[in-house]
């Protein structure tokens, strides 16, 4: 009897992706984040769908529709907080996934890496627009400040901003289009994620050593299905703990005040997962310079394959590079902390130094360390 799993046109795709996929036998838990991101995306799409059934994208009713969801809809508060904290979990998994890629040299798979960077941009855009929807103070002012950055573009800036706003300020038109885009983008992300996976399966997974593992592959199922299930259970545990015990831990209290264009909050800041980029933006006194640095802080990921000077793929056997990598992680966390602080004396200079170190590490120090390591190994 011919196995339907291997012959049926649809089952064959599923089989080659999740069942009979040849996988390196030594991939660690850092390889769990890909499947966790898939889980986060599905959770966000489902909770978002149920929220959209009760939400009204109108400046007069948006805020009260969220209150209605939390008070009057059956388990509406659970859905709302799962969605809000699900975004935080999404970004934790994203940053861990990117960090894993940087450490183990996964960026050598160019197509997979570049689609991953596009995915990162798309997820960031989606999260930003989602934050605007509750129409609280931070939603409104966050939207105003971030969209206003585009006015730094010479010649077309102001026109571009007004085109995005759909008027002369962030208003009803802006909220409606942000809702429409926030609804459609996750499906685009899903499509991109499938392409991301498609390109990955062209080459096969990397592994901690960075050495080709074609001679030592095992089937994905049952080994990695069970491993991914454990990861998924841990993710769900953390998400539920956060949602049920501290739903507002990562939010901003200002967003419980309805949006008021006449009153600016004392400290305008985005959600925690954008703070590192916000700190880089604020550390440059010039508007256009700040916007360029902000863009480059993410776009720099596209240049990482070009900056790979080592003869080894992974950092597993490269102590200097490891040291600089963890310095980069510490710098990322420092920038995240500084982005949430007010613009005053110690934080300003710390932010500028941390921003400088961020670019210096990626563009200069890490490639140089790799060259030194090559020399030491007489390669």
From Swiss-Prot:
Q: Does the keyword Electron transport apply?
A: yes
Q: Where in the cell is it found?
A: Mitochondrion inner membrane
Q: Which UniProt keywords apply?
A: Electron transport, Heme, Iron, Membrane, Metal-binding, Mitochondrion, Mitochondrion inner membrane, Respiratory chain, Transmembrane, Transmembrane helix, Transport, Ubiquinone
The GO terms this record gives for MF are: metal ion binding; ubiquinol-cytochrome-c reductase activity
Positions bound to a ubiquinone: 201
Per the annotation, how and in what number is the cofactor bound? Answer: Binds 2 heme b groups non-covalently.
Q: Which GO terms describe its biological process?
A: mitochondrial electron transport, ubiquinol to cytochrome c
UniProt GO cellular component terms: mitochondrial inner membrane; respiratory chain complex III
Q: Which cofactors is this protein said to need? A: heme b
Q: Does the keyword Transmembrane apply?
A: yes
Pfam families assigned: Cytochrom_B_C (PF00032), Cytochrome_B (PF00033)
Mode of membrane association: Multi-pass membrane protein
Positions with a binding annotation for heme b b566: 97, 196
Tell me which domain of life the UniProt entry assigns to the organism this sequence originates from.
Eukaryota
Q: Where does the chain cross the membrane?
A: 33-53, 77-98, 113-133, 178-198, 226-246, 288-308, 320-340, 347-367
Q: Which residues bind heme b b562?
A: 83, 182
Something else known: Heme 1 (or BL or b562) is low-potential and absorbs at about 562 nm, and heme 2 (or BH or b566) is high-potential and absorbs at about 566 nm.
Task performed by this protein: Component of the ubiquinol-cytochrome c reductase complex (complex III or cytochrome b-c1 complex) that is part of the mitochondrial respiratory chain. The b-c1 complex mediates electron transfer from ubiquinol to cytochrome c. Contributes to the generation of a proton gradient across the mitochondrial membrane that is then used for ATP synthesis.
Question: What family does the entry list?
Answer: Belongs to the cytochrome b family.
How is this protein organized at the quaternary level?
A: The cytochrome bc1 complex contains 11 subunits: 3 respiratory subunits (MT-CYB, CYC1 and UQCRFS1), 2 core proteins (UQCRC1 and UQCRC2) and 6 low-molecular weight proteins (UQCRH/QCR6, UQCRB/QCR7, UQCRQ/QCR8, UQCR10/QCR9, UQCR11/QCR10 and a cleavage product of UQCRFS1). This cytochrome bc1 complex then forms a dimer.
Q: This chain belongs to which protein, by name?
A: Cytochrome b
Provide the taxonomic classification: Eukaryota, Metazoa, Chordata, Craniata, Vertebrata
Annotated gene: MT-CYB
């Amino acid at each position: 009897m011919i196995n339907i799993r291997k012959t049926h046109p649809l089952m064959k795709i599923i089989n080659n992706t999740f069942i009979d996929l040849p996988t390196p036998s030594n991939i660690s838990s850092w390889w769990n984040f890909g499947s966790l991101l898939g889980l986060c995306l599905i959770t966000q799409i489902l909770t978002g769908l149920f929220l959209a059934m009760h939400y009204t994208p109108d400046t007069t009713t948006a805020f009260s529709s969220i209150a209605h969801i939390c008070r009057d809809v059956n388990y509406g508060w659970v859905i709302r907080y799962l969605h809000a904290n699900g975004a935080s979990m999404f970004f934790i998994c994203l940053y861990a996934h990117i960090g894993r890629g940087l450490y183990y040299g996964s960026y050598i798979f160019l197509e997979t890496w570049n689609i991953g960077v596009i995915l990162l941009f798309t997820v960031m855009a989606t999260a930003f627009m989602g934050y605007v929807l509750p129409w609280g103070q931070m939603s409104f002012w966050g939207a105003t400040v971030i969209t206003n950055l585009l006015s730094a573009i010479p010649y077309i800036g102001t026109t571009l901003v007004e085109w995005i706003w759909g008027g002369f300020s962030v208003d009803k038109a802006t909220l409606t289009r942000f809702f429409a885009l926030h609804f459609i983008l996750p499906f685009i992300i899903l499509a991109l994620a499938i392409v991301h996976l498609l390109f990955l399966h062209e080459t096969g997974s990397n592994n901690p050593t960075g050495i080709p593992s074609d001679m030592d592959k095992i089937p994905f199922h049952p080994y990695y299905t069970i491993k991914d299930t454990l990861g998924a259970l841990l993710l769900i545990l953390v998400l539920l703990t956060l949602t049920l015990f501290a739903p507002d831990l990562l939010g901003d209290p200002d967003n419980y005040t309805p949006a008021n264009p006449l009153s600016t909050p004392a400290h305008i800041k985005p959600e925690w997962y954008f703070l590192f980029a916000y700190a880089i933006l604020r550390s440059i006194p010039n508007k256009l310079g700040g916007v360029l640095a902000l863009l480059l802080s993410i776009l720099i990921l596209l240049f990482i394959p070009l900056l790979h000077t080592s003869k080894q793929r992974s950092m597993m056997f490269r102590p200097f590079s490891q040291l600089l990598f963890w310095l980069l992680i510490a710098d990322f966390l420092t920038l995240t902390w500084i982005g949430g602080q007010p613009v005053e004396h110690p934080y300003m200079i710390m932010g500028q130094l941390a921003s400088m170190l961020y670019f210096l590490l990626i563009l200069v120090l890490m490639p140089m360390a790799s060259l030194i390591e090559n020399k030491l190994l007489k390669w």
